[in-house]
Amino acid sequence: MTTLGTPLSPSATKVMLLGSGELGKEVLIALQRLGVETIAVDRYENAPGQQVAHHARTITMSDGEQLKALIEAERPDLVVPEIEAIATPMLEALEAAGVVRVIPTARAARLTMDREGIRRLAAETLGLPTSPYKFCDSLEELQAAIDGGIGYPCVVKPVMSSSGKGQSKIDGPADVKAAWDYAMAGGRVSHGRVIVEGFIDFDYEITLLTVRAVGANGEVETHFCEPIGHVQVAGDYVESWQPHPMHPKALETSQHIARAVTADLGGQGLFGVELFVKGEQVWFSEVSPRPHDTGMVTMITQWQNEFELHARAILGLPVSTALRAPGASAVIYGGVEAEGIVFDGVDEALRVPQTELRLFGKPESFTKRRMGVALAYAEDVDTARERAKEAAGKVKPRKA
């Protein structure tokens, strides 16, 4: 039996989120609806999640001592990493000492904080199908890896980055240095290490949201949402839709891969498993042990969206991944470099049938920073995609 307390009282169930962007904000809202006391942590003040949490804290989360001091001061029941750039060795030490429970586990947070840990787990430990790959610490190593078997075309990514930053495709020798420089500029921390992957000529890529939650018998069970299709530009998602049609064999293989990798990572919660698909063939790409940006579409397609599923699963509550209606999401970019922007056209956007908007409340806009998302549902995915893109296009961010 799960018992939940009352916020801001001695009985409170306290959850701390490390990372409070637009995804963290929705998790915090889902937790608050269940009467959980929330602590939103980020590296900058007034982050989206901090605007809705009971408590807002600003620290350098990659600094182990700062992280330890905050956790010991706040004494949360659960710590929920929402980004990669966190001092995971400290989380492992605190979890091992019984100070706090990390979602899904501190080991999972460490393995998924960069592309190397999770790729080696998937390909070398679990034997799951992936693209051919090498890890490189210099431009010379990158060139040697390409010449030694990876070949052209290939994809280069920093071992640690988010939202596609630093990711590029190399079509020939003339592109190698530019790709290395771009990866170095786009890495989340100063790491100087990249993964180079042989290019898979896939038909499409999906996100398979996978939930590990406690069932009625007290055992952890694995649940799958309907597959989410998405379009990425330079590694960053620009639209997604659910469900994405798949060959039954490919869906079965996708679920097998997702079950294997999430079972090894362990714990409870929602995972975003990214996969490449060609016909009946499936390759593992990446996994995030938390809600996924492409999964924002579930705010309009599912009875319980990905954020509610994550909140329920980490609290030991039952979950349902049932689909409510086909739907789509389309990103709204800042388009300007400014603080405290305003949005024109919100009324026009919401006149598009069966649409919703989420404006994230980020304090500062950049040209390609994700500032909101349009959501739409319809009788079919194609109509929903058209509506979402139309609504997103009517929202016009500008300087105040």
Swiss-Prot record:
Gene Ontology cellular-component terms listed: cytosol
Pathway(s) per entry: Purine metabolism; IMP biosynthesis via de novo pathway; N(2)-formyl-N(1)-(5-phospho-D-ribosyl)glycinamide from N(1)-(5-phospho-D-ribosyl)glycinamide (formate route): step 1/1
Enzyme class: ligase
Pfam families recorded: ATP-grasp, PurT_C, RS_preATP-grasp-like
BP-aspect Gene Ontology terms: 'de novo' IMP biosynthetic process
Segments forming domain ATP-grasp: 120-315
GO MF annotation terms: ATP binding; magnesium ion binding; phosphoribosylglycinamide formyltransferase 2 activity; phosphoribosylglycinamide formyltransferase activity
Identification of the protein by name: Formate-dependent phosphoribosylglycinamide formyltransferase
Gene label: purT
